[in-house]
């Protein structure tokens, strides 16, 4: 039994915890350089160890960080597989990922070890959708080819048959993954006169379908055979690895284009390169690659592709917003509450 003074002291501690008063400054290790404004705020709030040189950690350095930190802030370049996570120290309680995708983290092993995982959803949506739409335009209209002609001094003047591309207005766009980003892509594409088709685990709410005038395809194979442009906007999970397999790529029209701003592993990159080289697909716009930072050498030689170095969400605004979400997740954890963006294995 607690005496009256002890009960009062206990109640005060509980109220303080519920009000969000920090119990302490957790030791936070950040694996990559973040925007200055984000790092400044993190130093104010936490015992923060930064990476000012922005050199990716080796696997040994990453394991050492897991052993030392109470909170680890990794990015997509850090491979936190089960072998790494089982070596985490007893004080590690939170992996606050700087990014929406968590396919580089073994979330289930983290859960088994009592380590929460959070991400930064929502704040990358519009910027990634912008880049997707840019690629949807750039590939059929041969924009990069045209820029190279100018830079190489090969432009000799306009002619009626010069640099002819393909019209996108009125074409069918097939979106694979109709989450936040997929829907944002659909809104942009609809404004450009594209017909919206999509494949998802389940149909989106009817109000969204009506707004986008979108057609749902339960069968991915059937949709791929009928659309003119495919946009990959689904996460990489064990179920979506090589979702666009050689067989499915061959089911597409030879005049079709494919755009990927999601994860490279969703497409069989070798099969895609072979088909583009053989003229079995019209072109591709890729911001992500199966073995980043390596890119299939065949893709680098092709004229009918636009390749970008994983910059779909790369705006200053999105990076600051992502940092703010990381800070909120850490601060909420430090205050003894459930982080708002916690990733549950069943969600993946």
Predicted feature descriptions by range:
Residues 113, 121-172, 184-187, 191, ...:
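Phosphate-binding beta-alpha-beta segment of Rossmann-like dinucleotide-binding domains, i.e.
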Residues 1-3, 7-71, 193, 197, ...:
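N-terminal glycine-/charge-rich "phosphate-binding" loop or analogous flexible N-terminal tail
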Residues 19-20, 24-26, 111, 118-131, ...:
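C-terminal helix-to-coil terminal segments
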Residues 31, 75, 98, 233-236, ...:
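Short, well-ordered coil/turn residues at beta-beta hairpins
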Residues 70-151, 165:
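Phosphate/diphosphate ligand-binding glycine-rich loop within oxidoreductases
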Residues 181:
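Hydrophobic/small residue at the entry helix of a nucleotide-binding pocket
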Residues 31, 174-176:
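Conserved N-terminal Rossmann-fold NAD(P)-binding element of oxidoreductases
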Residues 80-84, 201-298:
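Rossmann-like adenosine-cofactor binding region
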């Amino acid at each position: 039994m607690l005496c009256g003074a002890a009960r009062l002291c206990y109640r005060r501690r509980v109220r303080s915890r519920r009000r969000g008063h920090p119990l302490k400054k957790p030791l936070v290790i950040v694996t990559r350089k973040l925007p200055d404004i984000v790092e400044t705020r993190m130093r104010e709030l936490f015992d923060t160890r930064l990476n000012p040189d922005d050199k990716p950690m080796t696997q040994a350095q990453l394991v050492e960080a897991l052993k030392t930190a109470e909170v680890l802030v990794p990015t997509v370049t850090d491979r936190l597989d089960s072998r790494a996570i089982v070596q985490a120290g007893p004080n590690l309680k939170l992996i606050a990922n700087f990014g929406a995708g968590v396919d580089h983290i073994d979330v289930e092993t983290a859960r088994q070890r009592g380590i929460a995982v959070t991400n930064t959803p929502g704040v990358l949506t519009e910027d990634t959708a912008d880049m997707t739409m840019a690629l949807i335009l750039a590939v059929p209209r041969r924009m990069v080819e045209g820029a190279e002609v100018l830079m190489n001094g090969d432009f000799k003047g306009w002619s009626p048959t010069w640099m002819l591309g393909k019209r996108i207005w009125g074409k069918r766009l097939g979106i694979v993954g109709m989450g936040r980003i997929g829907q944002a892509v659909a809104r942009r594409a609809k404004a450009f006169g594209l017909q919206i088709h999509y494949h998802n685990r389940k149909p989106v709410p009817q109000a969204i379908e009506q707004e986008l005038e979108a057609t749902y395809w339960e069968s991915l194979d059937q949709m791929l055979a009928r659309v003119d442009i495919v946009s990959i906007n689904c996460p990489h999970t064990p179920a979506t690895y090589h979702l666009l397999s050689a067989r499915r790529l061959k089911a597409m029209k030879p005049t079709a284009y494919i755009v990927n701003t999601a994860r490279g592993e969703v497409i069989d990159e070798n099969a895609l390169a072979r088909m583009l080289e053989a003229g079995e697909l019209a072109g591709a716009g890729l911001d992500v690659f199966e073995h980043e930072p390596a890119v299939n050498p065949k893709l680098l030689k092709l004229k009918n592709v636009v390749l970008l170095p994983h910059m779909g969400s790369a705006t200053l605004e999105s990076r600051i917003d992502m940092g703010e979400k990381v800070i909120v997740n850490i601060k909420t954890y430090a205050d003894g509450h459930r982080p708002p963006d916690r990733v549950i294995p069943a969600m993946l």
